[in-house]
Design a protein with these regions (language model features):
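Long, contiguous N-terminal structural blocks used for assembly/anchoring
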Residues: 1-85
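Amphipathic protein-protein interaction modules
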Residues: 58-124
Length: 147
């Protein structure tokens, strides 16, 4: 197995130990930031790589939909952050602070799902991350706040 693959000019290196052992780790631009992308697939076929590119492109094109899905389930985070920061944080402030911290893509056929963690800057989530899941049919849901 090759220990490196190139996807759209980005190097992905095979992780031989640790939490992502057996997966390829690289960086891609998501929502204007260099973001860790974990790509797990047994065969590094062209079809699998195209699926990864499709998922990342979809995420870049659907930022507003992702943020809307998060806010729909977690609107109370604004009040929590306002209390923690002892200042009024508006919904726009909170939305503007959200970014994708990392993305995990496991290619398993046509309906492959992927997940990613939303983070904030400033740290309105107080060290936590919001895990988001996108189904093979591109349905978005928040799987909870971790950390």
């Amino acid at each position: 197995m090759d220990n490196m693959i190139l996807i759209e000019g980005n190097k992905f290196k095979l992780q031989e130990d640790g939490i992502y052992s057996g997966a390829y780790l690289g960086k891609m631009n998501i929502w204007g930031r260099e973001t860790d992308v974990i790509f797990e697939n047994v065969d590094k076929s062209e079809e699998a790589i195209e699926k990864l590119i499709e998922k990342v492109s979809w995420l870049n094109d659907n930022k507003l939909n992702v943020i809307d899905a998060f806010m729909e389930e977690n609107y109370e985070c604004i009040e929590f952050a306002s209390e923690e920061f002892d200042t009024e944080i508006t919904e726009d402030d909170f939305r503007d602070a959200l970014f994708v911290g990392n993305i995990y893509i496991f290619i398993n056929g046509k309906d492959s799902e992927f997940s990613f963690d939303l983070d904030t800057e400033p740290d309105y989530l107080c060290g936590h991350l919001a895990n988001m899941i996108v189904s093979g049919k591109y349905e978005i849901e928040c799987d909870g706040i971790n950390g």
